[in-house]
């Protein structure tokens, strides 16, 4: 099977304490690895101010994951759970061409 490189960027609520944020990141990293993805990098980008209010917040913590996957099983599960998680304000999954 051919491996495809993806990048996931998601925005975490700024009012989460460090322990809750770490648990959230570890949980979503585990969702990907449990479904066959290989994480290359998972790191906080920065806390950034929004151009407009999202979910009652004016800023959020951006987190970026770079990964390799042979299928979309892990990505679909990540997408499904990120949509229903109140701590993730927005997320985006893109296929990298490099």
Curated annotation (Swiss-Prot):
Signal peptide: none annotated. It holds the Pfam family Ribosomal_S6. InterPro entries: Ribosomal_bS6 (IPR000529), Ribosomal_bS6_sf (IPR035980), Ribosomal_S6_plastid/chlpt (IPR020814), Transl_elong_EF1B/ribsomal_bS6 (IPR014717). Keywords: Ribonucleoprotein, Ribosomal protein, RNA-binding, rRNA-binding. GO terms for cellular component: cytoplasm; ribonucleoprotein complex; ribosome. GO terms for molecular function: small ribosomal subunit rRNA binding; structural constituent of ribosome. Transmembrane segments: none annotated. CDD domains: bS6 (cd00473). GO terms for biological process: translation. Binds together with bS18 to 16S ribosomal RNA. NCBIfam families: S6 (TIGR00166). Belongs to the bacterial ribosomal protein bS6 family. This is Small ribosomal subunit protein bS6. The gene is rpsF.
């Amino acid at each position: 099977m051919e491996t495809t490189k993806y990048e996931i960027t998601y925005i975490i609520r700024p009012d989460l304490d460090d322990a809750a944020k770490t648990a959230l990141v570890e949980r979503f990293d585990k969702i990907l690895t449990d479904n066959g993805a290989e994480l290359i990098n998972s790191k906080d980008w920065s806390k950034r101010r929004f151009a407009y209010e999202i979910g009652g917040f004016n800023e959020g913590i951006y987190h970026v994951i770079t990964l390799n996957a042979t299928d979309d099983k892990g990505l679909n599960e990540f997408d499904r759970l990120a949509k229903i998680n109140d701590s993730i304000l927005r997320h985006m999954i893109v296929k990298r061409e490099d």
